[in-house]
C-alpha cells in the first residue's frame, strides 16, 4: 500500500526479510478468510500504526524476485491527519516522506510497481 501526501510518498527501509535494505511500505500476507482490503488495513495498523480510510486499487503484480514468487496487490490508502510510525523495528530500520520525483533507492520491486501505477494508471505487471 502506498500513502501519498503533498507530492510525497511514505517509505520505510526493509530489514530482516527478503528485499532487505530496499524501500517499501506496509504489506504482508492474507490471513485465512481476509479480503485484500482487510489485509491492507490490518498490515498498515500493525506495521505503521495508522488507520486507513478510503482505499483505491492500484495494481496487481506477478513478482518473481528475492528467491520468492508471489502475487502482489497494491492500494493507495488515505491516512489523513495521521503520521506513520515504525511499529515493528525488526522489519524496518528507517522511514520518511520522500518527493515522488526524488525517491530513495533501491525500491522494493512491488513498491516500484505501485508508484509507477500511481503515476501512469498501469494496473498489471507481468512476471520478471
Task: Place the predicted regions along the sequence by residue.
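N-terminal strand-loop-strand
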Residues: 1-24, 52-56
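Short, charged/polar surface micro-motifs in flexible loops or helix N-caps
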Residues: 4-9, 17-19, 31-32, 76-83
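Conserved hydrophobic/aromatic beta-strand scaffold that supports enzyme active sites
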Residues: 11, 74-76, 97
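Nudix hydrolase/Nudix homology domain
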Residues: 18-20, 89-128
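A generic structural micro-feature
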Residues: 22, 65-71, 89-92
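The catalytic Nudix box helix
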Residues: 25-57, 75
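Active-site-adjacent beta-strand/loop module that shapes the phosphate/pyrophosphate-binding cleft
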Residues: 61-84, 111-119
Amino acid at each position: 500500500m502506498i500513502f501519498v501526501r503533498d507530492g510525497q510518498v511514505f517509505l520505510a527501509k526493509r530489514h530482516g526479510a527478503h528485499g532487505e535494505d530496499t524501500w517499501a511500505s506496509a504489506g504482508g500476507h492474507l490471513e485465512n478468510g481476509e479480503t485484500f482490503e482487510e489485509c491492507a488495513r490490518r498490515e498498515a495498523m500493525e506495521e505503521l500504526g495508522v488507520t486507513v480510510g478510503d482505499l483505491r486499487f492500484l495494481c496487481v503484480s506477478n513478482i518473481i524476485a528475492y528467491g520468492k514468487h508471489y502475487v502482489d496487490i497494491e492500494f493507495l490508502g488515505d491516512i489523513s491527519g495521521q503520521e506513520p510510525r515504525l511499529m515493528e523495528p525488526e522489519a524496518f530500520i528507517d522511514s520518511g516522506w520522500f518527493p515522488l520525483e526524488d525517491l530513495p533507492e533501491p525500491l522494493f520491486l512491488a513498491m516500484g510497481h505501485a508508484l509507477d501505477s500511481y503515476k501512469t494508471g498501469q494496473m498489471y505487471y507481468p512476471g520478471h
